[in-house]
Amino acid sequence: MEESTITIGRLAKRTGVAASALRFYEARGLIHSVGEAGKTRRYRRDAIRRVSFIRVAQAMGMSLQDIGAALADLPSQRTPTADDWARISQAWKPLLQERIDALCRLRDQLDSCIGCGCLSLERCKLYNPDDKAGEQGCGPRFLLDEKA
């Protein structure tokens, strides 16, 4: 194949992402291969920057769904530019702030709730009579959701 493409193994090595994860990203439409030479998937070189973009966004706590929505606005044969990143990051700032706020609430409650040993069912936020929190969905609602 031409030199403008790289194998999945080379893409994995260049980005630090396992080949299985790259296939997962491709199945989700986040990256696109341009064919196969033998039985090896090949990618355009711009896939290196797209995968790097995905890794940075994941490190920020963005879901693959959010990342996919952002990348969907870009042509598949182009990497995000500085202007693209500025636009995307502006859209993500409120989501990131929500996560920061939730983590701060959790941090502030750690000393008083987890392992406190108070055994006070009247004031303990972890107490859940009749499993009322179950109506709100799965997970530790009292610690992660201020509305609980």
Curated annotation (Swiss-Prot):
A GO BP term here is: response to oxidative stress
Q: Does the keyword NAD apply?
A: no
Q: Which SMART domains match?
A: HTH_MERR (SM00422)
Q: Gene3D superfamilies this protein is in?
A: 1.10.1660.10
Residue intervals annotated as DNA-binding region are: 8-34
Q: InterPro entries annotated for this entry? A: DNA-bd_dom_put_sf (IPR009061), MerR-type_HTH_dom (IPR000551), MerR_fam (IPR047057), Redox-sen_tscrpt-act_SoxR (IPR010211), Tscrpt_reg_MerR_DNA-bd (IPR015358)
Binding-site residues for [2Fe-2S] cluster, renumbered to this chain: C113, C116, C118, C124
Gene Ontology terms for molecular function: 2 iron, 2 sulfur cluster binding; DNA binding; DNA-binding transcription factor activity; metal ion binding
**Residue intervals of the HTH merR-type domain:** 5-73
Keywords assigned: 2Fe-2S, DNA-binding, Iron, Iron-sulfur, Metal-binding, Transcription, Transcription regulation
* Name of the protein described by the UniProt record: HTH-type transcriptional activator SoxR homolog
What is the species of this protein?
Chromobacterium violaceum (strain ATCC 12472 / DSM 30191 / JCM 1249 / CCUG 213 / NBRC 12614 / NCIMB 9131 / NCTC 9757 / MK)
- Gene (UniProt): soxR
